[in-house]
Design a protein with these regions (language model features):
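Hydrophobic h-region of N-terminal signal peptides that target proteins for export
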Residues: 10-17
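GGW-centered surface loops in extracellular recognition modules
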Residues: 28-61, 66-67
Length: 276
């Protein structure tokens, strides 16, 4: 049985943040973890969601960038964001929005989210749940959707080769681009309501933590090309901060992690493709 747990990002963990109550999901009695959709997904409705997804994939031109606690992060940077290092990436595609509940339901036939709404980002999904979703999505589309690597995520959050060097994804004023502690109204918000970043990507800071493909790992100062993280591990990386975090933890270089079967109402995903 998959579990819904309370998870915290603890300072004692190699890449953890200071423990905070906002990193915890609600009690299991409040969370619907596998709710079947009573209506079968009509073919036209499902296809409309799949077509929308493909039209929302943003081309991210490859390039070289400095990953980690760069100068604009200042004293807010945590040790696990260091050292900075040069990373070169090939081009890829990233969805301009976090996966919505409408898309998840069209593919999976259920909606596990704590907060409900078709255009809200799906949450209360684990890394393992996301792999099942992606497998079914690829079967439906004939594509090879995946989670972004941690390096791809940060490069895109920084604006790729259009970067303006912001502290958050798309702006130095967090409220312009993110739902976070100061403006969350105690819930997630529909995708795409805030301003986008330089690449036209929305909600890369705040709203939900976004899962990456990498196992947890530490940085080195060595230059890397298309890094994928450690080959094995016990915890997966997630990036971007969420609706419950303060500004410090929504910066574009912040790193966090969770177990592959952890779920929470602050955890979701964004899809990547190597080729469209």
């Amino acid at each position: 049985m998959k579990r819904t747990i309370l998870f915290s990002l603890l300072l004692a963990l190699p890449l953890g943040l200071a423990a905070k109550s906002e990193f915890c999901c609600p009690s299991a009695s409040k969370v619907e973890t596998d709710v079947p959709w009573q209506e079968k997904t009509p073919t036209l409705r499902r296809q409309a969601e799949l077509d929308k997804l493909l039209s929302n994939m943003v081309y991210v031109s490859g390039g070289t960038f400095t990953m980690g606690a760069t100068s604009e992060q200042g004293s807010d940077a945590y040790d696990h964001e260091k050292p900075t290092h040069s990373v070169t990436l090939r081009s890829f595609y990233l969805c301009k929005y976090e996966v919505t509940q409408a898309l998840w339901r069209a593919v999976m036939g259920n909606n596990p989210s704590y907060f409900k709404g078709d255009n809200l980002p799906v949450e209360n999904v684990s890394w393992n749940d996301c792999q099942t979703f992606i497998t079914r999505l690829n079967s439906l589309t004939g594509k090879k959707f995946r989670l972004p690597t941690e390096a791809e995520w940060e490069y895109a959050a920084r604006g790729g080769n259009r970067t303006r060097g912001y502290k958050y994804s798309g702006n130095n004023g967090l409220s312009n681009v993110a739902w976070y502690e100061e403006n969350n109204s105690s819930k997630t918000h529909p995708v795409g309501l805030k301003s986008s970043n330089e690449l036209g990507l929305y909600d890369m800071s705040g709203n939900l933590w976004e899962l990456c493909s990498d196992w947890i790992g530490t940085y080195s100062s060595s230059a890397q090309t298309n890094p994928i993280g450690p080959l094995s591990g016990s915890r997966r990386m997630m990036r971007g901060g969420c609706w419950l975090n303060d500004a410090r933890d929504c910066r574009l270089s912040v790193r966090a992690h969770c177990a592959p079967d952890d779920r929470g109402y602050n955890l979701g995903l964004r899809l990547a493709l190597s080729h469209l």
